[in-house]
Amino acid sequence: MKLASRKTATADVTRRQRSAHSSKEALYWIGPAALVILLIFGYSVVSVLISSFRYDGDWVGLENFEIVITDPIFLTALKHNGLLLLAVPILIILAFILAVTLFETRRGMRFYRSAIFLPYILPIPVVAVVFGQIYQLNGALNIFLRSIGLEPLAQDWLGDPSIALGTMSSVIIWKEVGFGVILMLAHIISLPNETYEAARIDGAGFWRTHLSITRPAILNTIVFYGVIEAITMVSWVFNYVYVMSNGLGGPGNATMVSELYIYRAAFQNKAPELAAAAAVFLFVATLILMVAFFRIQRRSIAGTFNK
């Protein structure tokens, strides 16, 4: 018995030594590349931060920030980013519904899963160009509506300031929902079947089962997806807006977002210092938003599992 224990202990020590050796070897390979990336990223961040306090080479303190945060166009851009955040709950709900539906649809699940995920892997500029044509005044959508007798519903989807931002958000939702479906579906498939079988025996229906069992079980995945999409809406929609509005954020700044504002300040208005100040402001605002989001979701998760 003692001999067996010694052999087990020796094997554990050997395993730990091999693991430590593998970790060191991996660090040797990854370290140089990681260091280069870190230096480049750090240099870029420091350069932007310093530029935000300068103008034409002179130190101006917070003057650039004052100009930016009092610029009506920048405030409009921030408001539009905030409105795009309203798409996050829609994405979460749609992804959850599609994920549980695919989970219950055993036949053809692979095909449907691929079809739903396909938009997510398409390049954003390609998606924006295609939908830009579809949503034109004489585009495919309006042609279809007129052909089925719904001409009153035909709109200038990208030319009407009141609906242009909503139109673009529909494109973002179409592209991003597949990512959430795959994340949630992968987690659902890993859950034990015994729980679902017990729920069926108790007479629980489709939605009761998934709202009472599936939703709490995959809440961490839902939170992760929500955070990723919130970051997307705040700081990753430039390509959609630039392509679909021809780089103008129009009509009449109706689709102006913070990223496009920074781009235009830096490259069109030749004011890189103002662009740097706007970028720093956006970074800090995004960081605060993410911290608040994580805290709220942590409390939600704790409340769910303490019930």
Give the ranges of each region predicted by the language model:
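A structural signal for multi-pass alpha-helical bundles of membrane permease subunits
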Residues: 22-307
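Short, Lys/Arg-rich, polar N-terminal cytosolic tail immediately upstream
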Residues: 1-22
